[in-house]
Amino acid sequence: MVELDWDALSEFVDGMWDDSALPDLYRFIEIPALSPAFDADWNANGHLDATIDLFTAWLATVPLEGLSVNVHQLAGLTPLILCKVEGTAPGEVLFYSHLDKQPEFTGWSEGKGPWKPVREGDWLFGRGSVDDGYGGYAGIISVLALQQQGIPHPTCRFIIETCEESGSPDLPAYLAECKDDLGTPDLVIVLDSGMGDYERLWITESLRGLIGGTLSVAVSAEGVHSGMASGVMPSSFRIARQLLSRLEDEDTGALKPDWLHIDISDELRADSQRICDVLGQALIDDFPFLDGVEAQSTDLVEALLAQNWRPTLSITGAGGMPALEQAGNVLRTH
């Protein structure tokens, strides 16, 4: 049995990452490959296809034995990559990642931007490299590192989609289409989650899940002067607040429906305490609070449970609210 040389493995992975993966991630950042939910013209724009082309071109440069690559695109659906690396040991592993991106947003630091790769020390700034462009590169390099030392490995497959940020609506069709090619994985590795620090490998055991929706409140067919209409016509903003208050306690942030909550077991609390023992105050202090803003809980265990196990309402956007410089004395229609 070949013994793994950890020092050599680390040196090889670091070299491959710096010399091969990072230059590609720079190019990946430059592609505004918004997920279909944020780009209705994604097919015509071709940015998702560009990420597919970029990654498959990189794969062609990697001396990985037993590698086969297939790009799938069903009619009207986003493209998907399916790779297979033949195993030299029993077992099957499935790696998952995605190449589509969230919208670019605003507020980037001076000299940085969503489609402009900037490296400062160990940090690479730009949209999508962490969520989730790195995933395929990291997985492929990990298998290559084993081959480089002659270490037997199981058959490894990689499924890389381009609509995850839209809720993966196209993925089920591809899972059915590629069923015979996906095998029967003994282990699924999803390289698309967070971590506590850079000193150890973190495993995500559970995600809270997400229910997304759009709340619309309309009160009039056209804008009317607020001085004339307020007090007679209801405020769409007030109605929205009332509806949100059915769901969320505005004083505490706690969500009201019982069905959104789970019982926090003693085991979960004990696990959370162990994590807090490792990470300490960084659990809270790593967030960019403004001066005077306090965390909702200063108890580390309670903060961790709230972050990972308790439901929360997050409002991520609003329409129908004019910018301040355009907000005249007009009652909003919606």
Which ranges hold each PLM region?
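Fold-level recognition of mixed alpha/beta catalytic cores in primary-metabolism enzymes, strongest
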Residues: 129-298, 302-313
